[in-house]
């Protein structure tokens, strides 16, 4: 069983991620979106901690990691222009990443992401 977090849980693609995480028997420990999407989230993971502020989401995930809890994957379901920043954040948090297409808007940003992968030892999976 893997532990997941999701960034952009209020987006139109997020329910597919929630469904996949749920149907494969994994846990969702935290979810973030700038708008309240608890109705969708609650249909799959009613006990998941939900945040509308990135700072609080980050604090929650960091504290969980410091307690020895694994955060295996972060799913990125935000608007395209945020994928690069959120992917870098998740890698630096110490998690592998599942990110919707496109991974970056500008191809030259791929080299930077690859460097962060190498620095952290974690990987990005683009779907």
Question: How should each PLM-predicted stretch be described?
Answer:
Residues 5-7, 98, 125:
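Conserved hydrophobic packing residues within short motifs/helices of P-loop NTPase cores
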Residues 29, 51, 125:
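General small-molecule cofactor/ligand-binding pocket signal
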Residues 1-46, 69:
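N-terminal Rossmann-like dinucleotide-binding module
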Residues 30, 72-73, 123:
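Short, Asp-centered acidic motifs that coordinate Mg2+ and/or phosphate
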Residues 49-116:
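Beta-loop-alpha module in the N-terminal Rossmann-like domain of NAD(P)-dependent dehydrogenases
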Residues 112-127:
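Rossmann-fold dehydrogenase core element
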Residues 44, 67, 118-120:
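Short, structurally constrained coil/turn elements
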């Amino acid at each position: 069983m893997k532990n997941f977090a999701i960034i952009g849980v209020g987006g139109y693609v997020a329910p597919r991620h929630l469904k996949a995480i749920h149907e494969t028997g994994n846990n969702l420990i935290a979810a973030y979106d700038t708008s309240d999407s608890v109705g969708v989230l609650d249909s799959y993971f009613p006990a998941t901690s939900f945040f509308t502020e990135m700072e609080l989401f980050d604090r929650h995930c960091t504290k969980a990691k410091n307690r020895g809890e694994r955060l295996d994957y972060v799913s990125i379901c935000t608007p395209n222009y945020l994928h690069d920043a959120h992917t870098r954040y998740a890698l630096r948090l110490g998690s592998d990443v599942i990110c919707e297409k496109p991974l970056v808007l500008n191809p030259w940003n791929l080299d930077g992401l690859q460097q962060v992968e190498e620095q952290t030892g974690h990987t990005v999976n683009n779907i």
